[in-house]
Structures are given as structure tokens and as C-alpha cells.
Amino acid sequence: MTSENQSSPRTLTDDRHGAVISDDGTYRYRLWRTWDTSKPVLAFVLLNPSTADATTDDPTLRRCQGYAEQWGYGKVELVNLFALRSTDPDQLYEHDNPVGPENNQYLQDVCEDADKVIVAWGNHGTLDGRGDTVTELLDTDLYALDVTNQEQPTHPLYQPRDTDLELFDREMQ
């Protein structure tokens, strides 16, 4: 699988739902849901996007939105270490550019604008040292739901709904 056809992203949105996806559909750079604009914004940095877009939710988005609502936020933003859209993390190892040509800028912009940032990519975040690269890129406090036995921040689908946040120790990676 290659990414020879680089294309600029397009934003698909309405008042409460949105996504930024490359024109060819290979990459999703940003996904969000808003339910109360008077409340703060919670961002999640996950591994890679799957099927969710401006109009379709997936289990990860629903779980992240559930946490955000439970903790008093009015918007959830999802960005990823790798922007390659795939339901199979093994595809990240096979693609020549799983990060995506514009991903770092979206990561920085979303995390800079969020009131709190949760990292939650699981053990595959060690691929090409990407987790370390992104934590160095982000100039804000980072939180995690928990960490794996490889000291990577756990994915939201593998945590109970009543999980508490903890400050993520960047040095553990």
C-alpha cells in the first residue's frame, strides 16, 4: 500500500459534528463532536482513525465522548499519532506514510486549543518511536487513563467508564 497521491484535506462539518479527511480518504486528521459550546474542550490523542467521520460514529468516538460528558466537557476532539484510516493497526506497519503529510500540524493545533489533552494510543504507539515524537511535539500537560505494561497510555475502549485521569509521565516511555 502506498500514499503516492497526496491530496489536501477537506473539512466535513455541520454545527455539532466534523472531520478533516484527505480528499482521497486515506487520512483523517481530526474528528470532533460538540454538544455544549459553553463548556471546555477535551482532546484525545489516539493511535489511528478507523471509520468515524463527520456523520458516522464508531465505538472509540462514543467512548471518548462519554468520558468527556461525564467529566463536564462540551466538546471532544480526536487526533491520532498516525492519520492513516484503518481498522487494522497492522496496516500502520505496511504503509509507507502512516503518519500523513499534515498530521503533526493538526495534532499541535487541536492540542493547543484544547482545555485538556488525554493520550491514549496503546502499545502500537511505539512504532517508529511515534509516541515519543508526539509527546515532544505537544507543549501541554498530557493525561492518561492508565498505562500498559510497556508504559504506553491505554486506549479508551480497554478502560472502565469510571476511570480517573492521571498525569502522563513522558519519561516513562
Residue ranges, per PLM feature:
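Short acidic (Asp/Glu) patches
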Residues: 29, 58-65, 97-105
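Short connector loops at secondary-structure junctions
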Residues: 74-90
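A short mixed-secondary-structure module that forms the rim of ligand-binding clefts
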Residues: 50-72
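Hydrophobic alpha-helical segments
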Residues: 1-3, 63, 71, 85, ...
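Acidic, metal-coordinating catalytic cores used for nucleic-acid/nucleotide bond scission
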Residues: 53, 83-85, 123-129
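Active-site and ligand/interface coordination hotspots across diverse enzymes
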Residues: 1-58
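Glycine/proline-rich loop-helix segments at beta-alpha junctions forming the active-site rim
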Residues: 92-173
